[in-house]
Swiss-Prot record:
Protein name: dITP/XTP pyrophosphatase
Cofactor(s) this protein requires: Mg(2+)
Quaternary structure annotation from Swiss-Prot or TrEMBL: Homodimer.
Classification via Gene3D superfamilies: 3.90.950.10
Organism placement in taxonomy: Bacteria, Bacillati, Cyanobacteriota, Cyanophyceae, Synechococcales
Highest taxon, organism lineage: Bacteria
Cellular component, GO annotation: cytosol
Length: 206
């Protein structure tokens, strides 16, 4: 029996690499999202947007789809950028520049990354949905060359390192996606045990 196909519902190369690394131990054929799929992120929470993306990509491809919606919430900015993290500016450097400019020289720089993960089937049913968090703070300047997005300016609590200064294994252990995936993995393993190689629906999760 061939391994089940799981499509990563993202066009972000950094996310695809990170999820491929997280999923490498499971009996899955991990595929990137095909070109041309656009999903409007109209949800008001990270979970809402993850559900929208997973359902849309699963329906479009005919395979299970794993989506995440993640973002950075900064206390001193009232939780911004939040669900608008990816739309805060046009590119990663511009998003970081805007964030640092808005924080200025404030000393209250507490922040957290959130990640909602969702797996959906082609019929629109939700097979699993979890959320993970990582506490930290915003640095005064970018540090490190690994990662993507806000990684260079987010220092993980009690680590002394930004995400961009961590190895993939270190980030897997401490990062919000890694923590969310730790919750998702046993659910995904159970799904694969019960239905390893054919697409099927499931009882929807509200």
């Amino acid at each position: 029996m061939t391994n089940r196909v799981l499509v990563i519902a993202s066009g972000n190369a950094g996310k695809i690499r990170e999820f491929s690394n997280l999923l490498q131990e499971l009996p899955l054929q991990v595929n990137p999202q095909p070109d041309g799929i656009q999903v409007e992120e109209t949800g008001i929470t990270f979970r809402d947007n993850a559900l929208l993306k997973a359902r849309a990509v699963a329906e479009a491809t005919g395979h299970w789809a794993l989506a995440d919606d993640s973002g950075l919430s900064v206390d001193a900015l009232g939780g911004a950028p939040g669900v608008y993290s990816a739309r805060y500016a046009n590119s990663d450097p511009e998003r970081i520049e805007r964030l640092l400019k808005e924080l200025g020289d404030r000393t209250d720089r507490q922040a957290r990354f959130s990640a909602a993960l969702c797996i959906a089937a082609p019929d629109g049913s939700v097979l699993a949905a979890v959320e993970g968090y990582c506490e930290g703070s915003i640095t005064f300047s970018a540090r490190g060359t690994q990662g993507f997005g806000y990684d260079p300016v987010f220092e993980v609590k009690n680590s002394g390192l930004t995400f961009a200064e961590m190895t993939q294994d270190h980030k897997k252990q401490h990062g919000h996606r890694g923590r969310a995936f730790a919750l998702l993995k046993p659910e995904l393993e159970k799904l694969l045990e019960n239905d390893p190689g054919q697409d099927a629906g499931a009882t929807p999760i509200p």
